[in-house]
Amino acid sequence: MRVVTAGIGLRAGHVLTTLKAAMPEVEIVGFYDPQPTFLDMIGPDTPRYASVEAMLAGAAPDLYCVFSPNLFHLDHIRLGLEAGVQVFTEKPVVVSIEETLELARLLANHGGVNRCMVGLVLRYSQHMVDLRAALKAGQLGQIVSLEASEHIAPYHGAFFLRDWRRMTDLSGGFLLEKCCHDIDIYNMITDSRPVRVASFGGRKSFIPGNAPASNAEAEIFHVKKSVWNSVDDAFHSDGDIIDFQTAILQYETGASLAFRTNLNSPDEHRRFCVMGTHGMAEGDFVRGYLRVTARDGTRLADHDYTSGAAVKGAHYGADEMMCADIAKYLRGQSNRLPVSILDAMEAGIAAIAVDQARNTGQMVDLTDTWAKLDSYGLRK
């Protein structure tokens, strides 16, 4: 399995080494990256190419991975589709609704959604494996409402305010970059898409008035390294992303979601509560549990993920599970993955619309946008 990558940052290095562990026949035969900071993770002797086009033509890959910054994704995915190679792209897929519709056109013209896999890794987590089983068994009944949050620690929030991800034109915004995972799994749980969204938020923590007063106090805000287009000070950042946000989403099924995020949460968590007509599910990725309870109070499931595979590696053990599933898929041992590129595109549209609502102060209706996306016939 000959693999090449556009981008060799920390995420690329981690996923590629995890994939190689799951699939020993993987051979990384080329990379394109003007600033290959984490090249040691895939091997310093990996052939370097001057462009994606040269790499796709010269390396004869079986799999082409897109790990470049978000604003480059559409063009890099386009090159892979046009070259006829299987593509894997890191989330989020693209940075605007217009780019999403252009990608839909490209996929429709180049073999459909199976041509491109996506790294929406939370779908692979044991939490979601077990929750899907509860949903399939009908333990929750019809989904009525959800509440959820992703609250990240100050060291991680500071990374976003220092890194290239601080600029919406480069990343698509914080909600798209970081919380598209979460929006995707709630689309999955409701088995539908948001039709109306509203949002409020801004920046109140990472501002000059809250800057640390000493070098010792400042250390926590530099724990996570940024390597491209970065600034040194999260509190005097030129970034335009939020550090707190609340969103309200209404789904095609009539279910609703209240979602919150905060980038300055010392005791971080990533939790969810799903209320159905016949039961409920409550869990937390960070704190490692999932409980399913019937409407008569009977505890139907009580999963503890604080030991074993779920606490190993990144994303609560889901990276290893994702790479194991991708290995089976590429070997022809399975015919589908838990998440598709179209799922990622739909989550991305929802995240972008939420930010549109926050910026305009108005509710955003997605009916016309879904009609445009559906016109490409990708959902089969």
Tell me the role of every PLM-derived stretch.
Residues 63-65, 108, 113, 252, ...:
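C-terminal helix-rich "cap/oligomerization" subdomain common to oxidoreductases
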Residues 113-114, 122-235, 361:
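Predominantly a Rossmann-like dinucleotide-binding segment in NAD(P)-dependent oxidoreductases
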Residues 58, 63, 69-70, 74-123, ...:
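Beta-strand-loop-alpha-helix segment that lines the small-molecule cofactor/substrate pocket
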Residues 1-43:
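N-terminal Rossmann-like dinucleotide-binding module
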Residues 203-253, 270-343, 376-380:
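C-terminal glycine/acidic-rich active-site capping loop/insertion
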Residues 180, 260-269:
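Glycine-rich phosphate/pyrophosphate-binding beta-alpha loops
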Residues 47-51:
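Short acidic-hydrophobic, aromatic-tinged amphipathic segments that line or gate anion-handling sites
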Residues 31, 64, 146:
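Receiver (REC) domain switch-region micro-motif
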